């Protein structure tokens, strides 16, 4: 604590904060001209005046009150009424204050604050961005225009200040010096309608703060943006220097015909003129090391970056230097840069291809201007189309020997576009593009025709209104998607149904009720092989609970491996009639089934989930005589599949795609059995044939946020299976009358026909389609069944476990059965 006591006042500073005693006011005195509403403060320092005491009567002065508003009053006014001000001129004065309190003559027009005669004033502002350094009697911000005269200085903010430092201004014209001394990008924010450097001695230093200027005019002098961010609506660059080191500067528009200032982009700095989407991502893809910085980003030390979404035409004296080593004088390593355009090692120029036509992105003022591009300088040409010529720079002197970089790995564009930089004697730097074949760049990709056509027809556009083209274009642009994610993302979306195991799960749930029917009609399912049993003439009612779990792995899908895990559960209920049929017994019946399940992808596709429901019906019949049994069935099964697939969030498309797919199976089969009874085991060889027509309906793959990506045509597979096997069983009768029959069945199941599904896919708006075949089942599988059935009187129960195995697939199932004989 510091105390200064005299006979008139007690002044207390506690932890840097002024404690004004009751009845005291901090004031500065000015001389007013009522005719012009001009108030002049000359050689003043704030004083603390007691109640009833004028500014002249106080001899307690304090030059620094950054936490206090200072009232501008008449020197002899004991009431300390605010002076009416239209123009406030401060000369020969040095002091710091939070702000000045005045009575504005015209609130709409505001007040002009004019610093002259070597004044050095520091003002802080308030807590919000609409605060002011001039306020009225109610502490409301007064619109403030500022002129900092040659030799004078205005400082906004204090680097060591603990509080927020914010204010808005009208026009601020700097002929002397303006310093923004910030204490952080979030806590120091100043906004300007216009910020203008208009004198050769003008110096503007914007440090550790966030700056917003609707208009900035650079005529003379220097504007230095240091460890700060600046957002400029319109820049009028007719002279002077704009130096950035390190900082982020965003310039929405350029006014005037030419760029007559020197733009020096220094160490770690980023300047964006116009707008380029996802610029920070592009910087990373080009090999720089960006890091978020306020409302923008900077790059690593030793790097520098300029992004042009609008063309720049250099005027007389205009210059662009992008090099981490440049200083505010425009020299690198102490040597002044003589070129009108200079791009150093580890610099990055990002150019929107839309401005790289005609005179190009950067146009020289005359052939006397030179351009240098160092060997390790990089160029990112955004959204370039194939078979085009893009002008990066034009109008310079001979560029053939001074432009070394911007080629090879230092030239970045769309993945399916070849680009070559050409620097010629005509003073231009151009990039010529040709199309790469998708199948060459990405062997095994599923949609090469679609990609080649889109690129060849120059349809690629990362902001296209066509969702499919936008998706494909973004997947091919490095800033949206890492190289290793391109094929999984494109192929997964183009093969959504296959990635979600639609065909496989449809076949599996269609086969489950067939297995239940065949078990029900099998000789091996008759618990009693001698005498009366449940299968005498009359009506049987039976039901099975079914559960299945199937795993598929390592199916080839172009350059990817595909697989999925599928689980389902459901039930089958049936009824049939047994009757005499010549020398044997005949049976006919009807069964219904229903269930639900889900499939989750595994392997290289992006994560895909299929939630499905299924239902079906079967007509079946059989004929048996002694040890011979023939079973036949005709069935229909329908599935509804709800598919969702994750896509990388970096695409900016809400991270998910979806599709609804209907699928079905019509199946017919015949199975013949022959039972050989022995005292030890009953041995029953069996053979069969089964036909399946597997249909996958056409569907549309969409973004979860809306918009069609792909249309997939319907497909019909014709599959034949030829199971051959043997069943081993034995009936055991207990003293209580229960009959127990354990059994085991082993089969081999060859398959023929369309064991692969055909996928025909196209993107709406692209005049091409792609076709591919993907395996759904192996050509040979092995089937094992193990179970037990118990029966007493007219009731039978059963429990079974089955397993299917092949090279790429493993399935397991559990059935629980019940039958009642009427």
What are these model-predicted stretches?
Residues 16, 26-28, 41, 60, ...:
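A composition-driven surface/loop motif
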Residues 1-3, 8, 67-71, 79, ...:
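Extracellular beta-strand/loop-rich repeat segments of large surface/secreted proteins
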Residues 20, 39-98, 103-105, 544-546:
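N-terminal segments that cap or nucleate solenoid repeat domains
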Residues 5, 14, 19-21, 29, ...:
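Feature marks extracellular polysaccharide-active and adherence modules
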Residues 472-678, 683, 798-819:
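Outer membrane beta-barrel translocator domains of Type V secretion systems
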Residues 618, 622, 677-678, 693, ...:
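Outer membrane beta-barrel transmembrane domains
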Residues 2-22, 27-32, 42, 106, ...:
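Extracellular, surface-exposed repeat/solenoid domains
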Residues 9, 37, 45, 58, ...:
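Serine/threonine-enriched low-complexity regions in disordered or flexible coil/loop segments
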């Amino acid at each position: 604590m510091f105390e200064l006591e005299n006979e008139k006042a007690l002044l207390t500073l506690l932890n840097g904060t002024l404690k004004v005693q009751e009845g005291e006011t901090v004031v500065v005195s000015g001389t007013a001209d009522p005719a012009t509403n001009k108030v002049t403060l000359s050689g003043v320092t704030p004083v603390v005046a007691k109640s009833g005491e004028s500014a002249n009567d106080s001899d307690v002065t304090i030059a620094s009150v950054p936490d206090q508003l200072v009232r501008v009053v008449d020197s002899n006014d004991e009431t300390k009424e605010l002076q009416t001000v239209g123009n406030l001129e401060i000369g020969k004065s040095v002091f710091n204050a939070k702000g000045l309190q005045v009575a504005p003559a015209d609130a709409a027009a505001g007040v002009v604050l004019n610093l002259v005669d070597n004044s050095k004033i520091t003002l802080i502002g308030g807590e919000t961005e609409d605060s002011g350094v001039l306020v009225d009697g109610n502490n409301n911000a007064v619109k403030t225009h500022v002129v900092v005269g040659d030799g004078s200085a205005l400082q906004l903010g204090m680097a060591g200040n603990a509080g927020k430092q914010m204010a808005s201004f009208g026009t601020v014209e700097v002929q002397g010096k303006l310093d923004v001394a910030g204490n952080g990008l979030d806590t120091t924010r100043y906004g300007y309608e216009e910020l203008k450097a208009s004198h050769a001695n003008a110096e503007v230093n914007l440090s550790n703060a966030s700056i917003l200027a609707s208009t900035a005019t650079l005529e003379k002098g220097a504007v230095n943006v240091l460890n700060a961010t600046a957002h400029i609506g319109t820049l009028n660059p007719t002279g002077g220097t704009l130096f950035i080191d390190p900082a982020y500067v965003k310039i929405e528009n350029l006014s005037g015909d030419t760029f007559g200032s020197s733009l020096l982009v220094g160490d770690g700095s980023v300047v964006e003129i116009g707008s380029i989407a996802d610029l920070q991502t592009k910087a990373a893809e080009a090999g720089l090391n960006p890091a978020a910085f306020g409302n923008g980003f900077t790059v690593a030390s030793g790097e520098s970056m300029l992004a042009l979404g609008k063309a720049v035409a250099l005027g007389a004296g205009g210059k662009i230097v992008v090099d981490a080593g440049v200083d505010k004088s425009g020299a690198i390593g102490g040597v002044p840069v003589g070129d009108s355009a200079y791009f150093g090692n580890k610099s990055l120029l990002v150019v929107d291809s839309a401005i790289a036509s005609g005179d190009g992105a950067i146009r020289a003022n005359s052939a006397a201007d030179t351009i240098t591009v160092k060997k390790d300088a990089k160029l990112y040409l955004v959204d370039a189309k194939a078979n085009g010529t893009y002008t990066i720079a034009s109008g310079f002197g001979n560029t053939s020997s001074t432009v070394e970089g911007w080629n090879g790995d230092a030239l970045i564009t769309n993945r399916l576009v070849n680009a070559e930089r050409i620097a010629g004697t005509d003073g231009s730097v151009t990039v010529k593009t040709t199309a790469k074949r998708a199948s060459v760049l990405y062997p095994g990709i599923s949609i090469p025709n679609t990609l080649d056509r889109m690129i060849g027809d120059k349809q690629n556009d990362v902001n296209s209104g066509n969702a499919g083209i936008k998706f494909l274009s973004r997947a091919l642009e490095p800033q949206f998607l890492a190289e290793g994610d391109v094929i999984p993302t494109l192929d997964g979306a183009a093969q959504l149904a296959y990635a979600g195991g639609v065909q496989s799960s449809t076949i599996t749930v269609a086969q489950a009720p067939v297995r239940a029917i065949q078990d029900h009609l099998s000789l091996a399912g008759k618990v009693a092989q001698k005498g009366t049993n449940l299968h005498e003439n009359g009506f049987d009612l039976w039901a099975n609970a079914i559960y299945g779990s199937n795993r598929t792995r390592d199916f080839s899908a172009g350059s990817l491996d595909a697989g999925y895990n599928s689980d389902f559960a459901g039930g089958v209920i049936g009824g049939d009639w047994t009757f005499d049929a010549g020398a044997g017994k005949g049976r006919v019946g009807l069964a219904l089934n229903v269930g639900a399940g889900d499939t989750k992808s595994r392997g290289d596709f992006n994560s895909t989930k299929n939630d499905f429901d299924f239902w079906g019906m079967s007509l079946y019949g059989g004929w048996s005589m002694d040890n011979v049994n023939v079973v036949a069935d005709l069935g229909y099964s329908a599935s509804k599949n709800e598919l969702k697939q994750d896509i990388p969030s970096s695409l900016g498309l809400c991270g998910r795609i979806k599709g609804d797919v209907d699928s079905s199976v019509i199946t017919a089969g015949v199975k013949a059995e022959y039972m050989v009874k022995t005292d030890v085991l009953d041995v029953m060889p069996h053979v069969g044939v089964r036909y399946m027509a597997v249909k996958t309906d056409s569907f549309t793959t969409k973004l979860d946020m809306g918009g069609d990506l792909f249309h997939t045509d319907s497909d019909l597979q014709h599959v034949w299976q030829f199971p051959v096997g043997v069943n081993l069983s034995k009936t055991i009768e207990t003293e209580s009358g229960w009959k127990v029959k354990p059994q085991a069945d082993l089969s081999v199941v060859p398959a023929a026909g369309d064991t692969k599904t055909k996928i025909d896919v196209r993107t709406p708006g692209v005049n091409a389609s792609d076709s591919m075949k993907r395996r759904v089942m192996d050509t040979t599988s092995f089937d094992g069944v193990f179970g037990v059935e118990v029966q007493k009187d007219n009731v039978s129960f059963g429990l079974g476990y089955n397993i299917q195995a092949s090279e790429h697939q493993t399935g397991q199932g559990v059935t629980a059965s019940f039958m009642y004989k009427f």
